[in-house]
Swiss-Prot record:
Keywords: Decarboxylase, Lyase, Pyrimidine biosynthesis. Catalyzes the decarboxylation of orotidine 5'-monophosphate (OMP) to uridine 5'-monophosphate (UMP). This is Orotidine 5'-phosphate decarboxylase. GO terms for molecular function: orotidine-5'-phosphate decarboxylase activity. It comes from Escherichia fergusonii (strain ATCC 35469 / DSM 13698 / CCUG 18766 / IAM 14443 / JCM 21226 / LMG 7866 / NBRC 102419 / NCTC 12128 / CDC 0568-73). Homodimer. Its EC number is 4.1.1.23. The active site is at 73 (proton donor).
Amino acid sequence: MTSTASSSSRIVTDSPIVVALDYHNRENALAFVDKIDPRDCRLKVGKEMFTLFGPQFVRELQQRGFDIFLDLKFHDIPNTAAHAVAAAADLGVWMVNVHASGGARMMTAAREALLPFGKDAPLLIAVTVLTSMEASDLADLGVTVSPAQYAERLAGLTQKCGLDGVVCSAQEAVRFKQAFGEDFKLVTPGIRPQGSAAGDQRRIMTPEQALAAGVDYMVIGRPVTQSEDPAQTLKTINASLKGHG
């Protein structure tokens, strides 16, 4: 089984930057995308945009050469999650995610659903603890350990299930690399260049700090999408990361 994404339009990038597309308007999103270069980043499409504009929007981004992280955080019974992940793979996305709190059977089913896709399978990542969550939020759910402890517990379960990595906060990255190894990919939201506002992400870090901490892919949103010159902003961040590599 192979994905439907066109390999001829895909442009390979070695940038760790994933730009979060958080737009309410399709035309505005595409106008932004047409200002940037797929060699400088990948793109993340989340629940709102995918619900509004559907798979065809993902295809339009792919036709422009971009790798897509489909950030839908599947969390369901194992069979349903597996079918959803397979549908994402058939769409040809570069990365897809599930909630680790869905449990081992769900994550294993999702991983096994990607086996028929072979080398065309997307990276399968699990969400540990959302970056907006604090200890008090977890306590409301009956979780008495800290966000960092809970994230590490879920990351360990994710690795046991054979997934490619986790979404985690940058503060957890150093420990996770030590605990789970270099091949276990770390995807981190809440990354903001120096001087950017924190927004609704509580646990934040600069791109240079994230790279030094062991983050493999860093999700950056408004500091790029709201920049007066997003193409130059991306080039500046990439250059700063190469300088720290």
